[in-house]
Amino acid sequence: MSVNSKSSIRAEKLRIKGTVQGVGFRPFVFVLAKSEGLTGTVLNDGRGVEAVVEGPSEALERFRTRLLKELPPLASIESVEAEDIPVEGRQDFVILESRSNSVSTVIPADAAVCEACLKELTDKNNRRYRYPFINCTHCGPRYTITAHLPYDRPQTSMKVFPMCPDCLQEYKDPLDRRFHAQPNACDVCGPHVDLKDKTGAPVSCEDEIAELLRQIQGGKIAAVKGLGGFHLVCDAANAVAVSELRRRKHRPFKPFAVMTLNDLSASRFVRISEKASKELHSPQAPIVLCPKTNDADRLLPGIAPELNRIGIMMPYTPIHWLLFFEAIGRPEDPDWYKKECDLVLVMTSANAGGEPLVIGNDEAVQKLDGIADLFLTHNRDILIRCDDSVMQQRDQDVQLIRRARGFTPVAVRLPYGGPSVIATGPWLKNTACLTKGDHAFLTQHIGDTDRVSNCRTLARAVEHLSEIFEITPKYIACDLHPDFYSTSLAEELADKYDAELVPVQHHHAHIAAVMAEHGLSEPVLGLALDGVGLGTDNKPWGGELLKVTPEGFERLSSIAPIKMPGADKCAREGWRMAAKIFAENGKTDALEKLAKDVNKPSLRLIAAQANAPETTSLGRLFDAAASMFGICHISSYEGEAPVRLQAASEGRRGQNRADLVEVISGHPNFVRLLLALSEYADKRQAAADFQETLAQVLAKKVITVSEKEQIRKVCLSGGCCLNSLLTQRLRKLLEQQELQVYEGLKVPPNDGGVSLGQAWVVLMRLHSTAKE
């Protein structure tokens, strides 16, 4: 563009914040500026990226517009601050070195192999042909290989692999896709794979990937090292191999996730929505639960028994892609990965039940003894264990169930900030949350803290994030329950930092997590539909209607309490609650049948326990219903009974039987409903009617309270909100009355989001107090 007037030339300094370091952002700015004929500089500093651009006003406007629209795959912008500066007649655009005193403020999340790297991986003329650790600034390991900030190679597990001249040249070239790609490597200078037998001894073979695939297709179970840990892998179409994996893992019914080459290949056994497909092929590459086709159980026997969905994932590491490339004969067609492929692999976390994910090579051989027949290891150390993230496909959207690889440590942006908070989360499905300013950083999924190993993982995760983000907390939030490990950890942290300890009620935190995700701090109604959490009255809650304000919460209502003979045992043995309900209502025949079904001659004595604790938990109500309807008496994995009840009802139109629900002192009592539905010959219809009635009764209660409290915003959260049939029906009923409904979508509605809620409760309270 020719410039006729000096006055049309301007200069600006742009301060760009967000995920803009370690993701190819400076080369992106460089190319963008060059294409618009601008001059200036770009550099990283401790606060983000600083760009100085000089040129015609029109070009500057186009540059800013394109800056927001044409981002690199892993980059995201939170804010751009522009400042006019003097025109200096700059002659070129250059990338400057990071300021010596700057520390990168963000570690990007791990990312699935990008399309450019995939093309190179399977191009026999490329120097990285079939190299299992190919990556660039747009993909590859990040969080899981980083020990400390700044995010530079010496701070990662790649520090032991000096780059060869070719890789170093790429690393230094601002126009190269691998410019400052910290894990950059090739077969000459980088990590390599090893194939080992079940004892850890090397397997003699010409090609490790080819031999691994041969053994998997021959029915063997392999442990394969990935980004955040090992997977146990077998042929998903081999019923014998799947059954053997279940036997070895002591996992009789819990569903397995499977990996397939693409949507076309997956369409034989699942139906994938457009939004689910987008997530499957995103840099995060989560597992997505998708509805089964009619052929699914025939094609993949034993993968997801008694369920209507299968968790699927696409290849996301070079090793995954190489297995599928090998399976279809190493084709020369560059679009080979778009073709149908018969290979389907079980990909399940490599760990003994409930233990942390295995990440070390020697650890894998030791801890997976008796489970894996062979091991594919490599010598790039995993520093931070990180499970696969899990989402579920719903009618209109997708919802996170487990937030881990690909999402950690990406921040949740809060409406406002405050003093730093560390929240240590709940007992089950634990995560912790650390805040800095208006950013909330959640740890990866930790799991249940009933095991010492998981407790150690939680403590290390908190320490790691606090070091990375230089967080010194003023407040430590935790659950009300005094006996949780997360509470003990919070007490230790409060002493360590001389910080104030703030206990937060479990369901209050559930609702606050949804508020944090959606940027809410005004009063809301919260419907917490959950398993069990300790209430302020020292009783187990779980079916609560709360009024949540910045100052705190008020319990407005709950479902009527039901008895739990055996207390916490009822979470696994739903028959206990079923027996109690049958016994208290004189259903002798039903009680005797139940005793035979569960092979418990002493069932009458258990049902007669006079001192059984009471709970308002909707989760326990689901457990009771599943047993009373004959769907599931004993859960072999957490949540099995409610999940199977939901699956049983799918495809049936539920009838509203609210006439069978008594309201006692404002609390809906569902016992009469359960008794009536338990007499149905068709248990699938019983399940459908149960959920429809639940939705109708709960919605009616919320609508009534909304009118009284003059609050139009409703947050749904808790473990039961993973039941998409229930929540989507609730949403429809509430929105028909023009209520605004919010759910956890990017942060799990189950206990995986509780730590975020704990932290937001503290920050809301502080903000409210400061305004007074």
Can you say where each PLM-predicted feature lies in the sequence?
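Intrinsically disordered, low-complexity, mixed-charge
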Residues: M1-D194
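Internal gly/pro-rich beta-alpha loop/helix module
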Residues: E70, E170, I328-P415, A610-T615
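A phosphate-binding glycine/aspartate-rich beta-alpha loop in the early core of alpha/beta enzymes
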Residues: D84, G229-N294
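Conserved phosphate-binding/catalytic loops in two-lobed NTP-binding clefts
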Residues: D479, Y497-H510, R712-S717, S724, ...
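Glycine-rich phosphate-binding/hydrolytic loop that grips phosphoryl groups
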Residues: H507-L529, L534-G535, G574-A583, A688-E692, ...
